[in-house]
Amino acid sequence: GFLWATVLAEHRLRDRLPSEWEGRDVQVVGVVASLPHGFERGERFAFDVEAVETPGARLPRRIMLSWYHGWLEDEWRDGLAIRPAERWRFTVRLKRPHGNANPHGFDYEAWLFERGLRATGYVRPRAVAQRLDDFVARPAYVIERLRDRLRRSFSEALGDAPARPDALTEPLKLAA
């Protein structure tokens, strides 16, 4: 048991963003691996990197991406909706995870580490984002797509009701 835990920990620790690739544009192909979480200016989601198309770049296998709509209407992504289990090509800019280590506070860096998210970043706003595949059939992705379908059903049923899906989708967040 101890040896296996050590091997897994070493494997996870090695899967990190090299410092020389922080803050640089990198083109990646991968799959949206989680239910996107919407916020005021965009969406945030886990992304499984399948291929790095920028020569010489090395990235972790799983990253947390934000995709911003932009401040101005002409910067919005032209109605591109992102869903779990889709394969995309993005140009991203990443950094290593950083979080506060307060004794009684939330440890963001540990939270990311527990989920295998070894870098955070964002989709570059003026670069071309291309959906390559509408559905990648792997068990974890199928579950995320089902969660997405359930969330969309709640949204359609409730419309603009004040209790909108936030309260109803809380079990979906806990299941993740």
Each language-model region and where it sits:
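Membrane-interface helix/helix-cap signal primarily in integral membrane proteins
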Residues: 1-176
